Structure formats: structure tokens, C-alpha cells
Amino acid sequence: MTTVIEFYISDKEREIVIEQLLEFFPKKKNCKDIEKGIYDFTKQYCKSDNSYLRLAQAIYIDCAKNIMFNLKDENNHTIKKIKKLIDKNKYNAYNLAFLNPEELNKDNWIKIIARKQMTEETLNQMATVEWKPCYACKNTSYHFYQLQTRSADEPMTTFYICKNCMKTYKVNN
């Protein structure tokens, strides 16, 4: 016997999302368009890999919460611009659900990318050593650093970071 799982989001859940969106948009039509976008995004996401069908309700709620979280953020200038365009009917509200996180909050993602680049630059400036093959990727090139993690009368702990897969190994000498 096989169980068939179909895509389903309850009408009650959809109405709740529309009511929550009314807090941010004066026109109910815009809220319905955004909700329809969230619904279609969830459906498209679940159809891309049928194993996600069981999670349809959770994916739908997560997408709705993500949009509302960004709408509540006072410092998010990108979403404020999009909201004004939606209110003036110059931007299709339906498309809001299909925006990537970096499109919903550009300022935050610029900071995240800059932090990641700085971390990579710091890693590239660290000392490099050839050591035993990495268990994950078989690479033998590592960055390493030492920290005094235990009492002063014991040797320092050496940390090796694989340059290829970034897996960290700790060695107590």
C-alpha cells in the first residue's frame, strides 16, 4: 500500500497570512497578491523535490514569516522602497515571495559578505603547513594556529584548518 502525499495549504492558514499582511499594506488586494505569491512559491519549491511535499505547510509559514520579519524591520531600507512601490502599484506584490534574502535586505547582506571576505583574507594570511590527509577531502594543506587552552604548565593546543573544506582538527601536544 502506498501513501500519496499531495500539496495542501489550508484556507484558514492562507486567511491568517492575509490578515497579518494587512498590518503592513492598506490594500487587501496587495495582501492577497503577496499571499498568492507565497502559496505559488511554496508549491514550486515543493514540486522541485517531492520529498518536500510533507513540509509544505512549514515552508509556507516560513516564507510568510520571512517576508513579515523583513517588513517589520525599521532599518531595512530595501523592503521600505519595495513597499512604497507596491503601494503605488509600480511593483507587482506577487513577486515579493520570490525575492532572495539578499534582494529583501541588501544592506544586511553587504555586511555579511564583507565579514566573510575579511575572514577569508585573514585565513589566507595565516601560516600554512603540510600535514596528514584530511578525513573529509584528502587534502594535505592546512592553516594552523596555537592557543593556550589548558593550564600554563601543559603544552599549547594546535588547531589545524583544512584549506580545502575548512574542517578543523584539534591536537593536544
UniProtKB/Swiss-Prot annotation:
Question: Do you know which SMART domains this protein is assigned to?
Answer: ZnF_C2C2
Q: Keyword set for this entry?
A: Metal-binding, Transcription, Zinc, Zinc-finger
Q: Which residues form each disulfide bond in the chain?
A: none
Domain TFIIS central: from-to ranges: 9-129
- Tell me the PROSITE patterns matching this sequence: TFIIS_CENTRAL, ZF_TFIIS_2
- Annotated residues for binding of Zn(2+): C134, C137, C162, C165
Family under the similarity heading: Belongs to the TFS-II family.
Stated name of the protein: Transcription factor S-II-related protein
Organism expressing this protein natively:
Acanthamoeba polyphaga mimivirus
Q: What is the lineage of its organism?
A: Viruses, Varidnaviria, Bamfordvirae, Nucleocytoviricota, Megaviricetes
